[in-house]
């Protein structure tokens, strides 16, 4: 239940909020897609933790690149 709610919220962000901003994610897959994959693979708690760590790495001083779940 919680997993579906979080993934739904991320999908809403991807569809309605993300297009309003310029592309800035330094990683592939994007941080929001990574978050969905992490929550699906690891569950809510560990998936959210991995998502938070990933989002904190997404800044101009990090090289980025391919970073799968």
Curated annotation (Swiss-Prot):
Query: Which keywords appear in this protein's UniProt record, sorted alphabetically?
Result: Cell membrane, Membrane
Question: How does the entry describe its membrane topology?
Answer: Peripheral membrane protein
User: Mind telling me which GO cellular component terms the entry cites?
Assistant: plasma membrane
Q: What is its main location?
A: membrane
Q: Which domain of life is it from?
A: Bacteria
State the compartments where it is located.
Cell membrane
PANTHER family given in the database record: MEMBRANE PROTEIN INSERTION EFFICIENCY FACTOR-RELATED
**What's the family?**
Belongs to the UPF0161 family.
Q: Tell me, what does this protein do in biology? A: Could be involved in insertion of integral membrane proteins into the membrane.
| Name this polypeptide is given | Putative membrane protein insertion efficiency factor
Organism from which the protein derives: Desulfitobacterium hafniense (strain Y51)
